[in-house]
Amino acid sequence: MNLRTVALAGAVGLVLADSSIVVLALPEIFRQFDTSISGVSWVLIIFNLVLALLAVPAAHLARRFGPGRSAAVGLAFFAGGSLVCGLATGLGPLLTGRAVQAAGGAVAVVGALELMVSTFGDNRRAVATWVGAGAIGAAVGPGLGGLLTELVSWQSIFLVQVPVAIVAGVPLR
């Protein structure tokens, strides 16, 4: 497996881990921002909603601008959104950051799939790698989020993603 494939799998895993990484941090966010349960639930909802809604438009972007460039730009937006989340001082900025993360994540994940298909030349192997990376990310997300929240802070679950997204995006340019 070459560096580009590892970066692609890492990008998919990172984005899909983020779909669930906040679950165990929600009580801390709820307390810190003194918000309602429905308000704090949007921290989880907005990410998954935007990610799902932008998947098809992201595929059009990947075809128009190329999957490598799209995936790298998507990861840059994901990193920027993660930074906004990690520095958020209220629920509004946190939700904005989550929406930006998801928009970037949608573009990155779709671009990664197209790059994997072209890299492997075998759709089944590419899709299996893509799905496997996503499943691992989604499975690791809650535990990692809970650990970081307990040991450091809820903000750390977002701030740690910034350098990871940047490093994953470099080989994709």
Where are these regions (language model features)?
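Transmembrane-helix bundle of Major Facilitator Superfamily
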Residues: M1-L172
